[in-house]
């Protein structure tokens, strides 16, 4: 599961819902990416659009750096929770990981997103990062192959994906992913 992480500058009052991000400076994933689409889909459900928020679409590393420099009020990142960039942002004392308290409701309105929880202390038990359970939404990553791909290659791909991804992550249980259909 690839969660959608939203980080706020600590100096920005945490809005009760994402609707409170209207009028803010938001750094978004690259325009046209699935990550940007997910972020814009969630924001649109709360009435936040390009017309009423200042959205900048940057590459992930540039987006994180701009957020950390204070050039934006909030940043949207859709990455695996064990990604080094996510860990860096979680550990930044000037940033707060924003919870989607309506994660189940979001997943009922946007069918490709699923609710997930990042447990308190999941990143660092000693420093207790994050300092609270954080409700998130995320999307599964799909691998689609051509119908004429040789079955042995398909089997090898499935075997490799199981080897790499079958373990527990910070937001999913062991064996939950990958799942095969078709």
Question: What kind of feature is each model-predicted range?
Answer:
Residues 1-3, 21-23, 92-95, 138-140, ...:
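Extracytoplasmic
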């Amino acid at each position: 599961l690839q969660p959608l992480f939203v980080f706020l500058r600590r100096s920005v009052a945490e809005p009760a819902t994402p609707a409170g991000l209207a009028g803010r400076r938001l750094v978004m994933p690259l325009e046209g990416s699935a990550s940007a689409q997910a972020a814009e889909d969630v924001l649109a459900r709360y009435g936040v659009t390009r017309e009423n928020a200042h959205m900048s679409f940057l590459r992930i590393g540039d987006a994180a750096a701009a957020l950390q420099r204070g050039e934006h009020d909030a940043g949207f990142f859709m990455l695996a929770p064990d990604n080094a960039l996510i860990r860096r942002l979680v550990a930044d004392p000037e940033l707060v990981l924003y919870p989607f308290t309506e994660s189940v409701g979001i997943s009922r309105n946007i069918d490709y997103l699923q609710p997930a929880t990042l447990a308190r202390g999941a990143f660092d038990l000693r420093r207790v990062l994050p300092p609270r359970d954080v409700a998130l939404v995320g999307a599964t990553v799909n691998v689609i192959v051509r119908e004429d791909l040789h079955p042995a290659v398909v089997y090898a791909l499935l075997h490799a994906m199981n080897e790499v991804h079958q373990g527990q992550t910070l937001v999913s249980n062991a064996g939950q992913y990958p799942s095969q259909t078709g």
